A protein has these predicted regions:
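Acidic helix-start/capping segments at beta-turn-to-alpha-helix junctions
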Residues: 13-15
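Nucleic-acid endonuclease domains
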Residues: 2-11, 21-27, 33-197
């Protein structure tokens, strides 16, 4: 495989693995980092899993993506979950010589690594405020095991949900309308099996 780095900082994914003998075989790998919640160490802060905007909806689009989304055989996260170092006081403006490397205070510790397909650790909530990003689950054991909200439903449900996130309008039962914004509402709307959520 050849390693193709993202051409721009805001492109998805961070790295594309492209088969040398057949360049139509590609795998997307995005690097993700987050920290453990110090008061609830079984939880982490979560992270974004990429956009659910243009390139996610239009699988042939080349906007903000290295290769069209639909041309990848799989979309993976290589992640690091860590603890923030307690009480580390650091002067971020201070420079150090290379021979002082062992004396530099670390701001992170207790690293845990994971690799999983991104749809397997997705939640049904956006990941970053106003931007069109998919959010992750935040239970660390579930992240490492790939037990996100879509893991029993399958990748098709992940794709359908995020392509339609907050776009489908339904009656709210009180004479008004609302946008579908939870996986349960979406699965019910599509007559799916909500017990798989």
């Amino acid at each position: 495989y050849k390693v193709v780095l993202a051409e721009h900082q805001n492109y998805y994914p961070d790295i594309s693995f492209v088969k040398a003998a057949d360049e139509s075989v590609r795998f997307a790998v995005d690097f993700k980092t987050t920290y453990r919640n110090p008061k609830k160490p079984h939880l982490c802060n979560g992270f974004t899993l990429g956009s659910h905007g243009e390139y996610f909806e239009n699988r042939t689009s080349t906007k903000n993506i290295q290769f069209p989304y639909g041309s990848y055989s799989g979309h993976f996260c290589l992640g690091i979950i860590y603890d923030r170092a307690d009480g580390a006081t650091i002067d971020e403006t201070k420079s150090h010589n290379i021979d002082e490397l062992q004396a530099i205070t670390s701001v992170a510790k207790n690293f845990q690594f994971f690799v999983t397909e991104k749809w397997m650790i997705a939640s049904d909530k956006g990941g970053s405020g106003n931007t069109a990003n998919i959010g992750s689950i935040n239970n660390i054991a579930d992240i490492v095991a790939g037990r996100g909200m879509f893991s029993k439903l399958g990748e098709h449900w992940f794709d359908e949900y995020w392509m339609n996130y907050k776009k489908i309008t339904v009656q709210d039962g009180n004479g008004g309308t609302k946008k579908i914004s939870t996986l349960r509402e979406f699965v019910e709307y599509k007559n799916g099996d909500v017990s798989l959520i």
